[in-house]
Amino acid sequence: MGGRSAQPRRFSFACRILHPAVAHDAMAGSRYILRAPASIIRLAQHGWLHCCLHFFLFPAMNDVCFVAKGSALYLFTVEIIVFGSPSLRHNVLSFFYFALPWFKRQCRLKVNFNRLKEIRGIAQVVRKAFFISKTLPCI
């Protein structure tokens, strides 16, 4: 019971790291679901946080949607890791580090095992990058 209640708190904490107002709006039940990589990347350019929150809070309705969002999420996450400012990189990776375990559990009943394997692969990359980023200067 304790483990189950701890996850929403941990996810909520991860949201607050980034932007309390947007996190509150997303957790209150916004239903803006993105369905194509281009839409996600376009949103990421103007508001990557909103994109991240929607990806985690509202998983894919089907495998096609999931693959599209998963691929775009991975691409712009890597772009932020490589090209983002140190502070932005640290915040983004902090969010993913805390949110990925929660997201994997939410998806367990919604996607097949191949998709879970893909999520775990993304999680490993993000976790490695997160720990590497802690050694970099943060503005």
From Swiss-Prot:
Q: Which domain of life is it from?
A: Eukaryota
Its recorded name reads Uncharacterized protein YLR112W
